[in-house]
């Protein structure tokens, strides 16, 4: 009985849906996290009577066919890249991007990774690094005798030194955008890598055309909406239960049919 397999695909799809929702809820306080959404599509159809076929009686064209779908499958899990709320931290090295763009960090392998998490600090060498100790590109060093650090909305990093009143520029933070952000490969640790699907990164200074601006002393909160996630969770749970009831009903029908023989 096909209904057993069809309902099974429905349960698998909703299990994936619940896993995505669970991950969203788990990361509701993760800095720079973007919620995800599972998308589904129907499977192939079995033709009981092909659309556009001729009637065996009169030879006339039948106005409709008889097709039975074979279930559902996960088509994609999209990342919703809506802006998260900005949270003030009081840390002068923390940065939030308001608008488009990703910070760039250099991995130990030399590869560049991308992130919306602007929780930054200093390495023992005085370089600006993320929470994993990866250097924020293009690599900016703050001298030990600096008494203050200012990062403007354009990503320009300036310091104040002892005995000086005028600030000194020590670097420029650049950010990157992609033709297709959905094509980025999530690595964990709030990091992404480019892929052939994302396209090559386009880098530029914050607040320039096409790029968001940087805000010092802030980080971007997760864009997860708990009310939305709980609503989606209830919907997915009910859909899972309905599919399980189809399996139960189909099994009972199959048992009845077997007993007739």
Residue ranges and their predicted role:
Residues 1-261:
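Amphipathic alpha-helical polymerization modules
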């Amino acid at each position: 009985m096909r209904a057993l397999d069809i309902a099974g695909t429905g349960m698998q799809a909703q299990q994936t849906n619940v896993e995505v929702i669970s991950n969203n809820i788990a990361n509701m306080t993760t800095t720079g996290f973007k919620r995800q959404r599972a998308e589904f599509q129907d499977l192939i159809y079995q033709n009981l009577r092909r659309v556009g076929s001729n009637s065996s009686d009169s030879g006339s064209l039948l106005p409709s066919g008889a097709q039975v779908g074979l279930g559902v499958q996960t088509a994609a899990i999209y990342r919703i890249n809506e802006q998260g709320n900005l949270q003030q931290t009081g840390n002068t090295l923390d940065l939030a991007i308001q608008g488009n763009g990703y910070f760039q960090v250099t991995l130990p392998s030399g590869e560049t990774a991308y992130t919306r998490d602007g929780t930054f600090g200093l390495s023992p060498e005085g370089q600006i690094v993320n929470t994993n100790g990866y250097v924020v590109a293009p690599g900016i060093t703050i001298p030990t005798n600096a008494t203050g650090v200012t990062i403007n909305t354009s990503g320009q990093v300036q310091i104040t030194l002892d005995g000086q009143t005028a600030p000194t520029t020590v670097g420029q933070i650049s950010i990157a955008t992609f033709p297709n952000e959905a094509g980025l490969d999530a690595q964990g640790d709030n990091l992404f890598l480019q892929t052939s699907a994302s396209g090559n990164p386009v880098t530029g200074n914050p607040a320039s055309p096409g790029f968001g601006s940087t805000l010092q002393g802030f980080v971007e909160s997760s864009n997860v909406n708990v009310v939305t996630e709980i609503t989606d969770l209830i919907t997915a749970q009910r859909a899972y239960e309905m599919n399980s009831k189809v399996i139960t009903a189909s099994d009972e029908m199959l048992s009845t049919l077997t007993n007739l023989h």
